[in-house]
Amino acid sequence: MTKVELAKLRTMIPEMRRVRRIHFIGIGGAGMGGIAEVLANEGYQISGSDIANNRVTEHLASLGAEIQIGHKPENVHGASVVVVSTAIHGDNPEVMAARELRIPVVRRAEMLAELMRYRHGIAIAGTHGKTTTTSLIASVYAQAGADPTFVIGGLLNSAGTNARLGTSRYLIAEADESDASFLHLQPMVAIVTNIEADHMDTYGGDFTKLRATFLEFLHNLPFYGLAVVCIDDPVIRELLPEIGRATITYGYSEDADVQVQEFVQEGSQSQFRLRLQDGSFLPLRLNLPGRHNALNAAATVAVALEDHIPTDAIVDALAQFAGVGRRFQQYGEFDTGAGKVLLVDDYGHHPTEVRATLAATRAAWPERRLVLVFQPHRYTRTRDLYDDFAEVLAKVDVLIMLDVYAAGEDPIPGADGRSLCRSIRQRGTLDPIFVATPAEVPGVLADVLKDGDVVLTQGAGNVGQLSRKLAELKLSINAMKTAI
């Protein structure tokens, strides 16, 4: 951003008083790194720490951020404010040092709320579909020349980043319910894609509390704000009479304000039309597969039309959408030495997400054998949704199961990869292969792959690094057998 553009931005969005250097603990996460990037481009000094370097930290360093590997008390010296990710606890040495030095410590969502304060905020919440919906909206607004600021939980392929500082009043961002921190946000438009049991440890195992928290999030809208919600979701349908804000519904349901009709998947693309609120129809081609992604597109259209985004920009952006990192990301088809095999990677880590991804994969390549490499994410989620996982994972042709990616949690007996394998095996339809570490997966794949297979790697942990490794090896049988 040029000095002239930044000066113009400052006429709309004043600086945070007395804040010069902002320190991020856990800066390597996509959400934290995205906010840090926007603030760096706004002219703030950025520093941060994490336990290891990654693409996010390397990118931020290229923007001038000071990155420290490891958490040490001295890292926070000179900071005006410290921002912490969900994974950072009060006993972190940098948090303790900041409090001793009386430096404000705020959560990620509080800093996002500050970015949103003077902007037209569009916040996307829900158990599933947040990242894709946020990316679709950002792409549509960019296509229309609206130049939005966006903060996304995944890499927007067309932009080459997950965050960008725009010159307009629009800020498009994911709203994270995992720790209820989305309640800090006060957007002008709030989307809720669905509400299912997840992160239940945050809500004391009480689904009623989770439901009430989503309602509170919607009530953070001003009275002149707009809620956009998926009426196909039974919990949202039940909530509708309680939402005291202007509301637009979308879905496949006949009574949706914006209804998805005539859905057809062609390979890894989709075609459908939307019946809009005025009764007119909008035919669309979406460069994504799956009925669930048509819903994400419907939410996007509902929001964009309310902001008077031109229809041709909407149509073009959805047809040309270049995707999001780790959301049905196709690495391509490789000649393995035993035939041609397609590699796809996906972030889905909840049974509903896995089910939707498997359905989209089957629809795209119905004649091909589906080999799933799955890594459960969090022991609490595996425990709470154990039967659902066992049911959906049994529906592939070959299942390679990794152990649980802990994400900082302590192990829970019976809520692990081996136990899931036993439960699936007892169903009698599939014999899963348990693999203790991602490093062992290439060798196992080398023994099971056949010509025409689709390999789908799925999960929210480090299985994404595994998929990149497999792509580097080009799924070569010989290379995978010797990989370490």
UniProtKB/Swiss-Prot annotation:
InterPro entries: Mur-like_cat_sf, Mur_ligase_C, Mur_ligase_C_dom_sf, Mur_ligase_cen, Mur_ligase_N, MurCDEF_pg_biosynth, UDP-N-AcMur_Ala_ligase_MurC. Gene3D superfamilies: Mur ligase, C-terminal domain, Mur-like, catalytic domain, NAD(P)-binding Rossmann-like Domain. Pfam families: Mur_ligase (PF01225), Mur_ligase_C (PF02875), Mur_ligase_M (PF08245). One of its GO terms (biological process) is regulation of cell shape. Pathway: Cell wall biogenesis; peptidoglycan biosynthesis. It is found in: Cytoplasm. It catalyses: UDP-N-acetyl-alpha-D-muramate + L-alanine + ATP = UDP-N-acetyl-alpha-D-muramoyl-L-alanine + ADP + phosphate + H(+). It is an enzyme of class 6 (ligase). Its EC number is 6.3.2.8. GO terms for molecular function: ATP binding; UDP-N-acetylmuramate-L-alanine ligase activity. The keyword Cell wall biogenesis/degradation applies. ATP binds at G126, T127, H128, G129, K130, T131, T132. Signal peptide: none annotated. GO terms for cellular component: cytoplasm. HAMAP family: MurC. Cell wall formation. This is UDP-N-acetylmuramate--L-alanine ligase. It comes from Tolumonas auensis (strain DSM 9187 / NBRC 110442 / TA 4). The lineage of its organism: Bacteria, Pseudomonadati, Pseudomonadota, Gammaproteobacteria, Aeromonadales.
